[in-house]
A protein has these predicted regions:
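Conserved N-terminal phosphate-binding loop of PLP-dependent enzymes in the Aspartate aminotransferase
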Residues: 1-194
């Protein structure tokens, strides 16, 4: 799963750089998010204690509140925009937004209207909407993909766990123009697939 999320981060950055060079490299993720235990996945994650070992965090990976109505009672989409402004992030600099379908063992979901507005905002900004479906995908929430509860279609889906019934396999799914940013073989390592 972490490797799939790393690939999602790489695709977002590459996508942004194709559009606007190094002016469009910011990745927005959410407080309390967990995207894995590798370097990039932990920087994208929203749990500060898991980042203590990382000496130099990437300043272009930022977290905003996750609107679950519990830890963050403010579920307005405007909070997303206000948070970016507070962090000094210009909308046009955002290459991608990565979110889990739900957070944690208690399955905290965002309101569907929030996610629908986020989808529209990403489209307007030419930023990729990336769903980390490692925990929620393959029927775990009652739909094949967890994001189906929101009535949106992401640009990139990072998935694992349920894909293989326990084998260490993950996948990244996306539109052709995103997935073709790298030629075959260039996103793999010694023992991974392509």
């Amino acid at each position: 799963g972490a490797e799939a999320c790393e690939c999602g981060i790489k695709l977002a950055r590459t996508w942004g750089r194709r559009i606007a060079g190094n002016r469009k490299i910011t990745l927005v993720t959410f407080h309390n998010a967990f995207h894995g235990r590798t370097l990039g996945a932990q920087m994208a994650g929203g749990i500060p204690a898991l980042k203590d070992w990382i000496v130099n965090l990437d300043p272009d990976i930022v977290q905003v509140p996750f609107p679950d109505g519990f830890r963050c009672p403010d579920t307005r989409f405007e909070l997303f925009l206000e948070s970016l402004e507070k962090l000094g992030v210009k909308p046009e600099s955002v290459a991608g937004v990565m979110t889990e379908t739900y957070q944690g063992g208690n399955a905290s979901f965002a309101p569907p209207e929030y996610v629908q507005k986020l989808r529209a905002w990403c489209t307007e900004q030419r930023a990729l909407l990336i769903f980390d479906e490692v925990q929620a995908g393959f029927g775990r929430t009652g739909t094949y993909w967890g994001f189906e509860h929101y009535g949106v279609i992401p640009d990139v889906i990072c998935c694992g766990k349920g894909i293989s019934s326990g084998l260490p396999i993950s996948a990244v799914i996306g539109r052709r123009e995103i997935m073709d940013l790298y030629p075959p073989g260039s996103m793999t390592s010694t023992h991974t697939g392509n």
